[in-house]
Amino acid sequence: MSAYIIETLIKILILVAVFSALGGFATYIERKVLAYFQRRLGPCYVGPFGLLQVAADGIKLFTKEDIIPQGANKFIFTLAPIIAMVSAFVSMAPIPFFPNFTLFGYEIKPLISDINIGFLFFLAVGAAGIYAPILAGLASNNKYSLIGSARATIQLLSFEVVSTLTILAPLMVVGSLSLVEINHYQSGGFLDWLVFKQPLAFVLFLIASYAELNRTPFDLLEHEAEIVAGYCTEYSGLKWGMFFLAEYAHLFAFSFVISIVFFGGFNAWGFIPGGLAILIKAGFFVFLSMWVRATYPHVRPDQLMDMCWKIMLPLALLNIVLTGIIILI
């Protein structure tokens, strides 16, 4: 077995382990953040400051009975959470999480695969995760799951179009689909960040990301007050945990991608080294998603579709046209 294959396998194991742990810990952080906004304590009983709540929740998930509803399609019911997990982690392959570094005289590239269409790969594989809630809802033999599945089809496909069109303008400026090249394009300093050249694209992509991630206020797929848990209604135990973990893994992936594309990525930020800089940026966007959840109410499905097709899509197309004109001039 070649050194390249061994290195890649080690990177994959580290990536899955780290982001699985981060996904679990993010639940604790989110509950604490929401508690702060609502003037509550949040988790505080299990361990110091409630830090062991994550371990307690993990034990509960792994020991719960795995139930498959009567009349459900067992194969598809089991396949759906696997698709969610695989798409979330595979989409991270072209993301450069840190600058290159040397370990024991060997240069390490902290990404799985440096492909020249990295951004397209990220969007395409992430979009494949749309099949998870659709199949889960169709296979569950439950009316609430079916409604959640229908909402997933409409919402995720609609915003996939918007996010793809939105990101075309920054890619036109850089001239590359590689996330590594996009990062290097902004290496000149703070003012080279694409957020200053493409502020509209940043805002549109951030909103579309929240809709694709099923984050509040766009969590129509599993809105508790309307459809119980949506496509997840019949899931329990490990299968439910896989959906849950995939959602947080995708949140971290989008946070890193937004940091790389619009905020200079892992380039040094003043006196702050690049590795620490990208962690601060990605951490901020994870926190921002929690802040938005605590602040904004849910939107209705018709309001969401109106915003997508009547506001965001025309703005994305207008931004592409204006960017093309500016480049030609």
From Swiss-Prot:
Annotated GO CC locations: plasma membrane
Residues annotated as signal peptide: none
Membrane-topology descriptor: Multi-pass membrane protein
Classification via InterPro entries: NADH_UbQ_OxRdtase_su1/FPO, NADH_UbQ_OxRdtase_su1_CS
Catalytic activity: a quinone + NADH + 5 H(+)(in) = a quinol + NAD(+) + 4 H(+)(out)
Disulfide bonds: none
Enzyme class: translocase
Family label: Belongs to the complex I subunit 1 family.
Official protein name in the record: NADH-quinone oxidoreductase subunit H
